[in-house]
């Protein structure tokens, strides 16, 4: 069982494990790592701020403008738990994989690296935007869902910089707009989730991406 946006209570984790399930919890800080370990999680996804899409934070509170990157975060998590750690956020090439493993991760998790693959279910306009020079940066926003998420900066994000921390209310309110934007291929109003290393995403087979990441 995989959890994000929070960690289930220890009693519930114990029930999952008794039923034969392993429990995976996404964490973004040493405090969350310690809490998930204490609850009985089997392994942790340590998500750095470089990651695309929603931050896996347990709360919806504001985060510091500058947070430690993935590599120092792995080290901080390792100091509070000996559970296996899966590193996520900005993993785009063989050197990033090697750095995460050297820092103490047991494995890595990639998302943005596969967005432009033909096997990806991302909208064609989203795939194209990742290589479009008009989109030159990513930022964290609550504009689309009410929870912090990293994506390509487009008009909708620029027009709504102060969206409230109201999830799922904002998510429900923007759903019709996002659906209409996707139907029209309107990249200025779509949620173009992407990590900081989005320019490294290539339009090639997923197997080729895996080979490049593994260095084999």
State each model region's role.
Residues 1-80, 213:
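Active-site entrance/lid segments in N-terminal catalytic domains of soluble metabolic enzymes
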């Amino acid at each position: 069982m995989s959890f994000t946006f929070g960690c289930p209570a220890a009693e519930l984790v114990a029930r999952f494990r008794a039923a034969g399930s392993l429990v995976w919890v996404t964490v973004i800080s040493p405090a969350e790592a310690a809490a998930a370990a204490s609850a009985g999680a089997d392994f942790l996804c340590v998500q750095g701020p470089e990651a695309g899409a929603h931050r896996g934070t347990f709360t919806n509170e504001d985060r510091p403008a500058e947070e430690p990157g993935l590599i120092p975060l792995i080290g901080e998590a390792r100091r509070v738990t000996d559970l296996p750690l899966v590193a996520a956020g900005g993993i785009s090439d063989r050197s990033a994989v090697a750095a995460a493993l050297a820092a103490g991760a047991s494995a890595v998790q990639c998302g943005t690296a596969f967005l432009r693959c033909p096997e990806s279910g991302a909208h064609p306009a989203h795939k194209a935007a990742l290589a479009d020079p008009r989109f030159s940066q990513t930022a964290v926003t609550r504009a689309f869902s009410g929870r912090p998420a990293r994506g390509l900066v487009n008009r909708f994000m620029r027009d709504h910089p102060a969206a409230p921390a109201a999830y799922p209310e904002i998510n429900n309110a923007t759903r019709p707009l996002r659906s209409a934007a996707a139907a029209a291929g309107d990249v200025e109003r779509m949620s173009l989730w992407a990590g900081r290393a989005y320019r490294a995403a290539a339009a090639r087979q997923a197997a080729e991406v895996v080979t490049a990441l593994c260095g084999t």
